[in-house]
Design a protein with these regions (language model features):
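Conserved phosphate- and dinucleotide-binding cores of soluble alpha/beta proteins
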Residues: 4, 72-78, 82-86, 90-243
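N-terminal active-site beta-alpha-beta segment that forms phosphate/nucleotide-binding
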Residues: 2-115, 119-122
Length: 243
C-alpha cells in the first residue's frame, strides 16, 4: 500500500487526478471504477480541467460506478447517474454508452445484481477503482456488518442514512430505502485501487482501515489485503494518526 500525504482537499484531488490520468494515458481503453460523494468532486474537476486543456482523452475509456439508489430514475437529482453525468461525464468526451451504473429502476434485485456483475466481467474487470471512505468505514454501500458481502447486492439503508438523506427529498417517503452496490469482492477484484480521504472527521476511521484488524466491522480494512492500493489523504485526515 502506498500512502501519499496531501496538503489539503485541493492537493488531494490533484494527486488523485494524477493517478487517474496516468491510467488513462497508459491504457486509453481502461475501465475506471468511479464513486460519487464529496470526496471525488475535486478530482473530477481537475480531470475536466486537464481534458479541456487537451491533456486527456476519454474517448476510449469505460467506466463502472460503485453504486446507485434503488427506485430513483436517472433524472432525479439525487440519483448517482445524475451526479456522474452532471459532475463528470457531460464535461468530458467519454462515450455515455461506455459508462455503467447499476440500474436503480430495475425492481428485481437479483436480476440487476447479476446483470451488473456480468457487465463488469464482460468489460474485463476494473483497472482502477476510485473509492471514498464513509465515516463508519464503509466503501460503496458496504456498511459495517457481521460478514463481507462479496458481489453486487441490494442493501437496506440504515435508519440514520434515510434520516440524513431526507433533507434532499420532499417527504421521508420519497427517500430511497435501498441501494445497489458492488460487493467487497467486486471491489477487491479491481487491479488497482485509489482511496481518497479528506478531513479530520475521517482520521480515526482511516487509521483503523489502514492499520487496524481486517474486519467486516470496518469494511475498508479489507483493502489491506489488496496488493495495489494507493491512498491519498490530506493532512487533516492524517491528523489523528499516532506518532
Ligand atoms: C459513493 C460511495 C460512498 C462514498 C462515501 C464517502 O459512491 O460509494 O461509499 O464514497 O460515503 O462519501 P463522501 O465522499 O461524500 O464523504
Amino acid at each position: 500500500m502506498k500512502l501519499y500525504r496531501a496538503k489539503d482537499y485541493k492537493d488531494m484531488s490533484r494527486k488523485a487526478a494524477n493517478v487517474i490520468s496516468a491510467q488513462v494515458i497508459m491504457k486509453p481503453d481502461c475501465v475506471l471504477g468511479l464513486a460519487t460523494g464529496s470526496s471525488p468532486l475535486g478530482t473530477y474537476q481537475q480531470l475536466i480541467e486537464w481534458y479541456e486543456k487537451g491533456d486527456l482523452d476519454f474517448s476510449e475509456t469505460k467506466s463502472a460506478n460503485l453504486d446507485e439508489y434503488k427506485g430513483l430514475p436517472r433524472d432525479n437529482d439525487q440519483s448517482y447517474y445524475y451526479f456522474m453525468y452532471n459532475n463528470f461525464f457531460k464535461h468530458i468526451n467519454i462515450d455515455l454508452n461506455n459508462t455503467n451504473i447499476p440500474n436503480g429502476m430495475e425492481p428485481d434485485s437479483a436480476k440487476e445484481c447479476a446483470r451488473y456483475e456480468k457487465v463488469i466481467a464482460d468489460l474485463g474487470g476494473v483497472d482502477l477503482q476510485l473509492l471514498g471512505l464513509g465515516h463508519n468505514g464503509h466503501i460503496g454501500f458496504n456498511e459495517p456488518d457481521a460478514a463481507f458481502e462479496k458481489i453486487t447486492h441490494c442493501v437496506d439503508l440504515t435508519e440514520s442514512t434515510i434520516e440524513a438523506n431526507k433533507r434532499f427529498f420532499a417527504t421521508i417517503d420519497d427517500v430511497p430505502k435501498q441501494a445497489y452496490t458492488m460487493g467487497i469482492g467486486t471491489i477487491m477484484r479491481a487491479k488497482k485501487i485509489l482511496l481518497i480521504v479528506s478531513g479530520e472527521e475521517k482520521s480515526s476511521i482511516l487509521y483503523k482501515a489502514l492499520y487496524g484488524p481486517v474486519t467486516p466491522q470496518v469494511p475498508a480494512s479489507i483493502l489491506q489485503l489488496h496488493n495495489d492500493v494507493v491512498v491519498v489523504a490530506d493532512e487533516a485526515a492524517l491528523s489523528k494518526f499516532p506518532g
